[in-house]
Amino acid sequence: MDGWQRVFVLHGRPYSETSLLLDLFTENEGRISVLAKGARGRRSNLKGCLQPFTPLLVRWSGRGAIKTLRDADPISLALPLTGSVLYSGLYINELLSRVLEQGTAYPALFFDYLQCLQILAASEYTPEYALRRFELALLANLGYGVDYLHCAGSGEPVADTMTYRYREEKGFIASLVVDHYSFTGRELKSLATREFPDSATLKAAKRFTRIALKPYLGGKPLKSRELFRQFVRQQPEKKEN
């Protein structure tokens, strides 16, 4: 690749004594693997910038599964994700590494990813709000074309107070059954707009994205979730006044 591309590092691991093997999310070519030769060496000027959550301009070469990094320049400082918000960032990175096939472009999803990181860093909304919006954007970019606004059985628009049960590959069908796969019409409308006005719609969004992402993730648990649980367990208990 001759030109520069905007990228983020999803994950990196040591390769040989001085190099790094990087999983990158690029604006125009999707997820790719890149070998950064000598990046861990003492004299490397890449040490500090090849980190998650740092916007980068990158050039690479090669036609195989693993490209060779040629140049990398930070566009700005890393987005400030700290504390519990850091684990939200690690979660979306792991999600992309697990779900996206290499070499498939997702330019709209790249923008959604950047927006998610910006919302997390700003702390204006809860991390859950940012994560649910991103998960729904990811599903849409993967071709998950479920219709949230119409009953899959009758074709009628969903009604706020009615209950609809999700059926994989079919959609939401009006039902009297209320269980893990059931959602109200109001909750479905919030999924369609990716806006969650209260805790009920936010919880419903989490329940749905867990259901919808499960086939993509298989049975292997996400490491970032376990790391977050460990972080929570290590926090001191708040004393009651």
From Swiss-Prot:
InterPro entries: ARFGAP/RecO (IPR037278), DNA_rep/recomb_RecO_N (IPR022572), NA-bd_OB-fold (IPR012340), RecO (IPR003717), RecO_C (IPR042242). Gene3D superfamilies: Nucleic acid-binding proteins (2.40.50.140), Recombination protein O, C-terminal domain (1.20.1440.120). Signal peptide: none annotated. One of its GO terms (cellular component) is bacterial nucleoid. GO terms for biological process: DNA recombination; double-strand break repair. Coiled coil: none annotated. The keyword DNA repair applies. Keywords: DNA damage, DNA recombination, DNA repair. Belongs to the RecO family. Involved in DNA repair and RecF pathway recombination. HAMAP family: RecO. PANTHER family: DNA REPAIR PROTEIN RECO. This is DNA repair protein RecO. It comes from Photorhabdus laumondii subsp. laumondii (strain DSM 15139 / CIP 105565 / TT01) (Photorhabdus luminescens subsp. laumondii).
